[in-house]
């Protein structure tokens, strides 16, 4: 699913998982503007894309929260841009709060069991 972060054609991305709270951003083909929450799962071939390029794009496009799930390192760096909180490291044993919601948590220990 394409996400056009701004007017530049260079900022069309395809996040692994995204949450869009404003349905007006959807036009039937893509999301026009920043999603509220994005999770990218690191692919072994190009981790810099998620750790550097997309981090830069998402922060500047006003994505509220961005997680990077790294199955190889078994880490989840959390970036809560809305509060200028960057790169808080969690491990797969943790239950992590989705900061943009009051009562939403993701239990990575359960995901870790599925990966092993």
Task: Give residue ranges: language-model regions.
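C-terminal interaction segment
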Residues: 1-61, 68-116
